[in-house]
Amino acid sequence: MTVLWFVSLILLISILLVAVKHSKRRWVRQPPSPPGLPIIGNLHQLGELPHQSLCKLSKKYGPVMLLKLGRVPTVIVSTPETAKQVLKDYDLHCCSRPSLEGTRKLSYNYLDIAFSRFDDYWKELRKLCVEELFCNKRINSIQPIKEAEMEKLIDSIAESASQKTLVNLSDTFLSLNVNVICKAVFGVNFQGTVLNNDKFQDLVHEALEMLGSFSASDFFPYVGWIVDWFTGLHARRERSVRDLDAFYEQMIDLHLQKNREESEDDFVDLLLRLEKEEAVLGYGKLTRNHIKAILMNILLGGINTSAITMTWAMAELIRNPRVMKKVQSEIRAQIGKNNKTRIISLDEINHLSYLNMVIKETCRLHPVAPLLVPREVISEFKINGYTIQPKTRLHVNVWAIGRDPEIWKDPEEFLPERFMDCDIDVKGQDYELLPFGSGRRICPAVYMGITTVEFGLANLLYHFDWKLPEGVAVEDIYMDEASGLTSHKKHDLLLVPVKSLV
């Protein structure tokens, strides 16, 4: 009888403890949330462009907003103050990444920099990339490659100018970055790969779509895969991964075959050397799949993001002739008389203050990753008095911050002068402008990305005047965004180059 009473007491205490635990959960003060639907929660409210839909919702529900996306609790922050709390004050509490099917596949089960969880492997890998790939020495070493590719591009555009034909700047900027990245990172010319230009661009676009496409598996972990099979997303994803893997293998084979005395070490050489030396990163040795995952980050991040920003910048400039004239006048006054073979250097670009303002304004209106890459909460913390619990996904709506009338006067207008006599920069310390993120998960290639955009724009604005195709007015320019992980211009930018006579 005594034993029975003792067991009953233990069970009663256990039940009470569970009840108290659940009671505490119920009374946790959570952020306000729009009403959702059964099963899908708030998924139907995201729309085609989630950052815009979430911006509208935040005006009603506040700067810290909780959504139930399928089975996944997701918090959206939409002001500089709340972004600072997430990215600085409580950075360590929410600097991991969620498990998403697209990123898992393309990153070889999270062996990369951008999408892997926060652990010792990620710390050491990021340190390696910052020190070896994105350091000033590496950036300076690829400048001759940039200049050589820019010379080819200027010659090509000059030919179009002489024939008065259109130039697709969306494709032009992407091709420029492809050629530079392939030479600087992989050590080969783009033409040395199995893919031609069009096929390669299709490969990059498809991979980015796979990263940004809606996957039911990401919101319904146990049954979502069935939906992905029926919609064909699973097959597309597998095909994209297979095509990218073939490209990585080709790059690696080329490095293993080439004469080391005739070529300078690039990043692939560095990774292959570490693999050969059985370098240890966090929880294990560097393997071939680690190398491919890192190459994925470089390929998709390095090529596409800068091209997107340059395209948006030129689109805004052609819509704002006053700004176009002003930035070209600055460049030409600083550099001097035009010359067919003249390429503007990085040192000269450092003196182009108005161009820098144009790029900041472009990043404000058109951040490449409008919701940044999602974070996952590791440990509980509070924002504005609201409790954010572990396993919650977290987005910073930098698109909403960039268009907040409480922060920016005339936020929908393209006004680079707003940055005159203003210390706000894009390097992650100013929470009003966060195109590259901030904190531990800030893009490690911020400087490389900025200099790439500056270099491309400065040279094309220096050598050419630009005008709209015949019969097209400024108001006819489509500025619609395409949906996905990155926010690129939905319609290609087609302009007519005119050789500058200045």
From Swiss-Prot:
This protein's encoding gene: CYP71B10
Report the SUPFAM superfamilies cross-referenced here: Cytochrome P450
Q: Required co-factor?
A: heme
Ranges that cross the membrane: 1-21
Annotated positions binding heme = C443
Annotated PROSITE patterns: CYTOCHROME_P450
Query: This chain belongs to which protein, by name?
Result: Cytochrome P450 71B10
Q: What protein family is recorded?
A: Belongs to the cytochrome P450 family.
Database matches in Pfam families:
p450
Q: Between which residues do disulfide bridges form?
A: none
- Its top-level enzyme class, in one word, is oxidoreductase
Which species does this protein come from?
Answer: Arabidopsis thaliana (Mouse-ear cress)
Q: Which UniProt keywords apply?
A: Heme, Iron, Membrane, Metal-binding, Monooxygenase, Oxidoreductase, Transmembrane, Transmembrane helix
What EC identifiers does the entry list?
Answer: 1.14.-.-
The membrane-topology field of this record reads: Single-pass membrane protein
User: Per its record, what are the GO molecular function terms?
Assistant: heme binding; iron ion binding; monooxygenase activity; oxidoreductase activity, acting on paired donors, with incorporation or reduction of molecular oxygen
Main localisation, per the record? Answer: membrane
Q: Name one GO cellular component term.
A: membrane
Q: Where in the cell is it found?
A: Membrane
Q: Which domain of life is it from?
A: Eukaryota
